[in-house]
Regions:
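Short helix-capping and inter-helix turn/linker motifs at the boundaries of alpha-helical repeat units
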Residues: 1, 91-93
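Conserved amphipathic alpha-helical segments that form helical-bundle/coiled-coil interaction surfaces
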Residues: 2-80, 97-100, 112-123
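Short coil/turn linker motifs that delimit alpha-helical repeat modules in TPR/alpha-solenoid proteins
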Residues: 38, 89-90
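Extended hydrophobic/aromatic segments used for targeting, binding, or gating
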Residues: 80-84, 88
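Helix-centric, low-specificity signal for extended rod-like, repetitive segments
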Residues: 90-91, 111
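Conserved, function-critical positions that sit in or immediately flank catalytic
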Residues: 104
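Short arginine-rich
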Residues: 122-130
């Protein structure tokens, strides 16, 4: 999965390039995802969380890659897989992982942000494609 290669690097780049406002926005998206009781609301804020990390890189190529990911995420087939495999417990797990990612970005821990994102994506992939 290409996302597993690129997105941890985006998290690492966000450590170096994110402003305080970027970090606040990422944290807000995480908080909003965590507050959702339905999959649609969670999916929206989960997408925002990841989009804001890409945006915080200040890298046009990475931001363009995220736009492609967003189109894929909104396709019917992807949504069907999400609905079948993303349980409440799994959403809670993803939110815990998001908290670790944003904490590492806020603390300017490049290796921590990269590894936390990698672990999160492995968890997502194994959860959706068991």
């Amino acid at each position: 999965n290409v996302r597993l290669i690129i997105e941890p690097q985006a998290a690492a780049a966000a450590v170096s390039n994110a402003t305080g406002a970027d970090i606040d926005a990422i944290r807000h998206a995480h908080d909003m995802a965590q507050a959702q009781d339905d999959l649609d609301g969670f999916e929206y804020w989960d997408g925002e969380f990841h989009r804001l990390i890409y945006s915080a890189t200040r890298n046009e190529l990475l931001m363009s890659f995220e736009e492609v990911l967003d189109v894929i995420r909104k396709r019917t087939q992807w949504l069907r897989i999400q609905r079948a495999h993303v349980t409440v417990a799994r959403r809670q797990q993803y939110c815990r992982q998001h908290a670790e990612i944003v904490s590492n970005i806020a603390n300017r821990n490049t290796n921590g942000a990269e590894e936390a994102m990698r672990q999160h994506l492995v968890s997502v992939l194994t959860g959706m494609f068991p």
